[in-house]
């Protein structure tokens, strides 16, 4: 069975990685792909991606390193989870970034945490949001684009409210495309 690696970058609570990996595995294992947690990476590997004026990291700069880790492990895809704030050129922030070519993605929990918005900490909500963003970025890794269905996990999240509205699953149209694309890579 092929593997998706979920790799913590910096300190990410073990329970978060475990719960996210279990959910993603519950979906992808039925499609011939298992999910496992990889060894933690130091944030210092990505210091060159830091933009001091913005106080954010360029998300795409994480992908080559994650891709190489996945390649060495024989993984089908690799997803990093970090607590640092991410951006991409032309955007104020991103929850995550993915590359189909590199078969890698990174998701930031920075803006997924309720505390970022002045709310009390809520581990269940953080897990739910992180699951949705990991499923979304994996969709991109496997060739899906954004979906107009606001309940589909592939819908673009312009804010955390958009993330909260959508479900952690692919809509029937995206599911069909994903299964077709997985047949090619498996």
UniProtKB/Swiss-Prot annotation:
Protease in keyword set: yes
Recorded hits in CDD domains, A to Z, give: Peptidase_M54
Q: Which InterPro entries match?
A: MetalloPept_cat_dom_sf, Pept_M54_archaemetzincn, Pept_M54_archaemetzncn_arc/bac
Task: Tell me the first and last residues of the signal peptide.
Answer: none
Q: Which domain of life is it from?
A: Archaea
Query: Which Pfam families does the protein's record reference?
Result: Peptidase_M54
Per UniProt, Zn(2+) 2 binds at 147, 152, 171, 174
Q: Which NCBIfam families match?
A: archmetzin
Know the name of this protein? Archaemetzincin
Write down the species: Thermococcus kodakarensis (strain ATCC BAA-918 / JCM 12380 / KOD1)
Gene that encodes it: amzA
